[in-house]
């Protein structure tokens, strides 16, 4: 595995044995450390590269469709004048702290605009979270005859952010049950058990809200939706996060109906940041089986 593991104590193994070295890595070519090429006596280029696009063509992986979800609040920040009374109240403690740090007298009024890169540090906005969840539940790829959103990972900013996402989901969709959307990070005691359940098609959760833990190294072929709800700065991590949805999955929608693609909802401008494109998501116009049966009963009643 020719990236991070070739350095430190593991490097001694390669120095000790006089043999042919074959290095394999999923790290994007532009991000591979020069020392890796030096170790393998290469001139900053790999001997062979098998791209994601080639793997899609050869039907080893599945492509994604992309929706760049515009959130003025996330991308451009928050203007004080645009805040509701409730949202201003949420920021009062922040402003009180800043007044103390800046030596501003307590009796003096103080507030300021919040920049886009401060959003998740200072404010978890329910309206934004609700929009993210509504977009997923409305336009995400579905299973079980349209009754359920397919297995989904929501990449959250931090533990508090992830907690609020789960709380809002349970308030908006109580009929789905408490296990439908669950938080997975290292602060959750039974996170290994939840991950094991998430990997099983017939078990809940259907939606995993992850803080770093599911960004890399997890293989769940049933994943149909990825929600990028945090800002990503690492190209390596970004590519690996996309990889969570690329696995093949046979008979996912029924006998002979295999997974053909997956959806990505990007709320934080990550695909623009990394100059990555994708075909547009198809807006959902299909009704679930329950909805179709209800409409049929109405027609019969008429």
Regions found by a protein language model. Name each.
Residues 13-17, 30, 58, 143-147, ...:
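Conserved catalytic network of the ASCE P-loop NTPase/AAA+ motor domain
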Residues 26-27, 212:
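Conserved H-loop
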Residues 4-7, 49, 126-130, 207, ...:
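Amphipathic alpha-helical transducer elements in NTP-driven molecular machines
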Residues 34-149:
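Interdomain helical connector at the RecA1-RecA2 junction of SF1/SF2 helicase-like NTPases
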Residues 3-24, 30-38:
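Short, conserved "post-DEAD/DEAH" coupling segment immediately C-terminal to helicase motif II
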Residues 98-210:
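Conserved C-terminal RecA-like helicase domain
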Residues 176-285:
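Conserved RecA-like P-loop NTPase helicase motor core
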Residues 112-124, 131, 268-302:
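Long, largely alpha-helical accessory region at the distal end of helicase-like NTP-driven motors
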